[in-house]
C-alpha cells in the first residue's frame, strides 16, 4: 500500500525532530507500506530566507526570491533522507522539479499543472523511500517556482493523487482538526471525521491545520486525507466525502467548528463613481494581480457616487495598492485597515436549521463586539470584527453552539 506523508516545519524543526520523523516514516515501512515523504522547511527557515533576500532589494525579483526560499525545503529533504539511510533504509531526496512537478510560471504563487511520476515510481520499485521538497516545482522552462505559503500540503495532495496513493497523511503539531483552535479555547474538541466541504470552509476561513487549496484538490482527486500529530500516535482526523465516513454518523451537528483568520485587511473605497461597469473594472484589475477578494459590501451613496468595502489577505496590500492606482482619480478616498479579523461559523447542519445567524449575532452583541461586515454561504457565516476582540469572539461562539461538549 502506497502512503504519502507530509511533515510540516514544526515537525522538522530541529535535528532531533528530523530524527524522530525518520523513525515515524520507518514505522510505516515496517508495516509493509511504500512511502513518499513531502517535507516543509525547518520551522522559521522560510521567514529567515525571505528576510535574507530582502537585504539585497527593496522590491525583490520574484524569480530570484523563489530560488532563495526553495532552498529551505531542499535542505530539510536532504537531511531527512540522510537520517533514513543512517537507520538502514535506502532513501533519496528530490526537489520539486526532480519529482516531476510542473507548474505555471507565477513565481511565489504558482499552480501545479501536472506531475510526471515516472522517476518516483522507479525509485519506489527499487525500495527507496522518496523524500520530496514540498512547496515547489518548476515551470515549462525549468524555472524553479514556489506554490505560496503552505504549499507543501498542496504538494503532498497532488502527489498522492498522481501516484494513486491509498492515503495522504498530513503531520503537524496538533492531534487533528478541532472545533476551534485549542490554543484559543482549551475546551475545543477533536473532530474524528469531517467532510471535504466542511474542512474546505474551515481551511478557507482561517483554520491552520490545512491549506484550503489542498482540501479543494483532495476533493477533486478523491484523495483520502488524515491529519495527525507527529509527536504522538493519536488517531487524528479523517477528511473524506460524506459518503465515505466510517460507521454511521448521528444526526449532523448544526455547527462543526469556529475558525479565526487574523490575516485579513479591509479596503474601504469612498465616493466611487457610480456607473455601470465600475465594479467589474475594479475587481478585474485585482484579479489580474491574483488578489483574492473575500467579503464585499457596496453602499449606495448620493450624487452619483457609492462606497465599496471588501477584504483581502493582509500580505497582498501592496499588490492591491498597485492594482487600484488607475482608479484613484475616480474616488474620494481609499483606506486600508489591518486591525480586523474574520470569525467564521461552519457546519453542514446549517442547511436545515434556521436562526443560526441570530444566535451568533446576539452572543457577540452581549459581549459588546461590533460586526463590521457579514458574509454567508450554505454552510458558513463569517463576520468581520475588530482584531482586539477576535479571541473573545471565538470563545463566545464556541460556547453558544455547545461545541465544548
UniProtKB/Swiss-Prot annotation:
Q: In which pathway does it act?
A: Amino-acid biosynthesis; L-lysine biosynthesis via DAP pathway; (S)-tetrahydrodipicolinate from L-aspartate: step 1/4; Amino-acid biosynthesis; L-methionine biosynthesis via de novo pathway; L-homoserine from L-aspartate: step 1/3; Amino-acid biosynthesis; L-threonine biosynthesis; L-threonine from L-aspartate: step 1/5
Q: Name one GO molecular function term.
A: aspartate kinase activity
Q: Which InterPro entries match?
A: AceGlu_kinase-like_sf, ACT-like_dom_sf, ACT_Aspartokinase, ACT_dom, AKii-LysC-BS, Asp/Glu/Uridylate_kinase, Asp_kin_monofn, Asp_kinase
- Which reaction is this enzyme known to catalyze? L-aspartate + ATP = 4-phospho-L-aspartate + ADP
Domain ACT per the UniProt entry, residue ranges: 267-344, 345-405
Q: What is its EC number?
A: 2.7.2.4
Q: Name one GO cellular component term.
A: cytosol
Which PROSITE patterns has this protein been placed in?
Answer: ACT, ASPARTOKINASE
Record keywords, A-Z? Amino-acid biosynthesis, ATP-binding, Diaminopimelate biosynthesis, Kinase, Lysine biosynthesis, Nucleotide-binding, Repeat, Transferase
Q: Which GO terms describe its biological process?
A: diaminopimelate biosynthetic process; homoserine biosynthetic process; lysine biosynthetic process via diaminopimelate; threonine biosynthetic process
Superkingdom, natural source: Bacteria
Coiled-coil regions listed: none
What family does the database annotate? Belongs to the aspartokinase family.
Which PANTHER family does the record match to this protein? ASPARTATE KINASE, ASPARTOKINASE
Name of this chain's protein:
Aspartokinase
Say which species the protein is native to: Helicobacter pylori (strain J99 / ATCC 700824)
Q: Which gene encodes it?
A: lysC
Amino acid at each position: 500500500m502506497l502512503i504519502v506523508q507530509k511533515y510540516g516545519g514544526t515537525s522538522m524543526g530541529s535535528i532531533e525532530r528530523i530524527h524522530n520523523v525518520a523513525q515515524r516514516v520507518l514505522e510505516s515501512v515496517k508495516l509493509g507500506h511504500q512511502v513518499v515523504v513531502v517535507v516543509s522547511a525547518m520551522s522559521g527557515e522560510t521567514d529567515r530566507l525571505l528576510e535574507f533576500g530582502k537585504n539585497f532589494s527593496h522590491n525583490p525579483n520574484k524569480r530570484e526570491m523563489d530560488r532563495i526560499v526553495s532552498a529551505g525545503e531542499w535542505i530539510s529533504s536532504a537531511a531527512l533522507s540522510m537520517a533514513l539511510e543512517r537507520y538502514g533504509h535506502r532513501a533519496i531526496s528530490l526537489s520539486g522539479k526532480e519529482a516531476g512537478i510542473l507548474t505555471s510560471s507565477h513565481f511565489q504563487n504558482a499552480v501545479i499543472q501536472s506531475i510526471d511520476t515516472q522517476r518516483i515510481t522507479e525509485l519506489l520499485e527499487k525500495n527507496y523511500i522518496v523524500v520530496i521538497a514540498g512547496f515547489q516545482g518548476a515551470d515549462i522552462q525549468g524555472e524553479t517556482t514556489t506554490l505560496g505559503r503552505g504549499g507543501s500540503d498542496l504538494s503532498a495532495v497532488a502527489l498522492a493523487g498522481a501516484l494513486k496513493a491509498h492515503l495522504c497523511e498530513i503531520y503537524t503539531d496538533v492531534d487533528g482538526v478541532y472545533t476551534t483552535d485549542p490554543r484559543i479555547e482549551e475546551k475545543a474538541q477533536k473532530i474524528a471525521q469531517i467532510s471535504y466541504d466542511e474542512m474546505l470552509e474551515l481551511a478557507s476561513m482561517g483554520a491552520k491545520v490545512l491549506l484550503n487549496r489542498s482540501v479543494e484538490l483532495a476533493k477533486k482527486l478523491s484523495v483520502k486525507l488524515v491529519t495527525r500529530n507527529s509527536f504522538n500516535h493519536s488517531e487524528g482526523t479523517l477528511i473524506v466525502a460524506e459518503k465515505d465516513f466510517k460507521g454511521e454518523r448521528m444526526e449532523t451537528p448544526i455547527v462543526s467548528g469556529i475558525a479565526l483568520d487574523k490575516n485579513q485587511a479591509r479596503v474601504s473605497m469612498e465616493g466611487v463613481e457610480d456607473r455601470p461597469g465600475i465594479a467589474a473594472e475594479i475587481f478585474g484589475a485585482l484579479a489580474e494581480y491574483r488578489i483574492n477578494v473575500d467579503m464585499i459590501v457596496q453602499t449606495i451613496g448620493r450624487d452619483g457616487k457609492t462606497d465599496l468595502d471588501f477584504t483581502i489577505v493582509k500580505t497582498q496590500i501592496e499588490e492591491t495598492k498597485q492594482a487600484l492606482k488607475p482608479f484613484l482619480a475616480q474616488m474620494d478616498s481609499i483606506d486600508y485597515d489591518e486591525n480586523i479579523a474574520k470569525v467564521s461559523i461552519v457546519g453542514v447542519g446549517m442547511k436545515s436549521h434556521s436562526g443560526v445567524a441570530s444566535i451568533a449575532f446576539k452572543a457577540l452583541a452581549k459581549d459588546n463586539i461590533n460586526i463590521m461586515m457579514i458574509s454567508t454561504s450554505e454552510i458558513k457565516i463569517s463576520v468581520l470584527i475588530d482584531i482586539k476582540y477576535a479571541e473573545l469572539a471565538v470563545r463566545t461562539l464556541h460556547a453558544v453552539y455547545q461545541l465544548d461538549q
